[in-house]
Amino acid sequence: MEISRQFVRQKNPCTDGFRWFMRHFQEGSDYQPLLDALVAAGRVSDACWLMDQFGPTKAVLEVDALEAEAVVFAGSLLVRGPIEVDSVLRIGGSLRAESGIRVGRRLQLGADLWAAGNVRSLGSLHVDGDVRADWNLLVGERLDCGGDLRVGWDVEVGTECTIGGQTAVGGDVAVGAALK
């Protein structure tokens, strides 16, 4: 998807973000390279805003492991090893991890989450679809699950927990505030 100057302007971006876009991409850019450039420049919130405006893609990325400060990917992601992200992991589609997931601040997905190990977000976890963690699910702040929640062992949520579908947990459940 080509993102032009006019296309971005129609979405009413912040002045600083639009100036950055014009300095770096005067002729426009493809969607994912623009998201990557924003993240590399430390403009993670701008990359998330852009994804809010333009939505997910059907792209699928497969990697052996993922270790980064922040990741914003518009498609779906398959990771064969561990995932370690210091701040934000934002995926437009689904995330499948054949190991554990650790995110420092926020984990947000536009579809389903499946992890063969622990899922740990020190901040919030927002998943529009189903969540499946074969081990523990540990969320430091708020959990929003739009679909079913299936966890092999324990669930621990620091504040509020909202689940849109059915819940199956193999161990204990601890929620710091309301469970909806």
Report the location of each language-model feature.
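Short, glycine-biased loop/turn motifs at secondary-structure junctions and
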Residues: 1-180
